């Protein structure tokens, strides 16, 4: 079906003007893609679908770009169904490739955060303290509260790495500063203390 999501999201962001924007959407995107007239332009599983989906992801990311803003995008977690998993991989691939060219986008690795020991889908996950928690509801898709918290905590950690309270964020697209490890649109590194002329000598 057709819905101009990129335009709507851009409008909402322009009105709300968030500095940190967290999104986890797209779980139902593996369907026919249509134009405004309802005409099918791409079907799932075809090369054309990947091209069109990438174009729409690009539109979303570009529409949400703004100075002093970072977009934290959660990749779709793996699912139990092999058929649907292929769609998840296809969607995440296009998102990863788009984000690689857009330094104002930080990806949260939903598949890795909810994976089992083999790195794939898991009904249960083991926490660092050894405690095992249920990760999925019976449909093999939706996350439980416990697993949602894992993803949320990881997202908050990424936000904390990007911003320090009270600091001003750099403009979107600012190159990585190797002196402080901050990425684009994150806070600038602390300025070096001014030099005291009285402390200098002529030898």
What spans do the regions from the language model cover?
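Second-shell loop/turn segments in exported
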Residues: 1, 11, 42-51, 61, ...
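Conserved SGNH/GDSL esterase-like catalytic core that processes O-acyl groups on lipids
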Residues: 1-52, 186, 190-203
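Extracytoplasmic/secreted proteins, especially bacterial periplasmic and envelope-associated proteins
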Residues: 4, 8, 20, 45-48, ...
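A generic secondary-structure signal
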Residues: 11-12, 59-63, 97-98, 158
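Extracellular/periplasmic catalytic domains that process cell-envelope and extracellular macromolecules
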Residues: 13-17, 66, 100-101, 150
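Structural recognition of the beta-strand scaffold that forms the well-ordered cores
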Residues: 19-25, 70-75, 106-109, 142
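Active-site segments of SGNH/GDSL-like serine hydrolases
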Residues: 24-30, 34, 58-92
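Catalytic His-Asp segment of secreted/periplasmic serine-dependent ester chemistry enzymes
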Residues: 79-193, 197
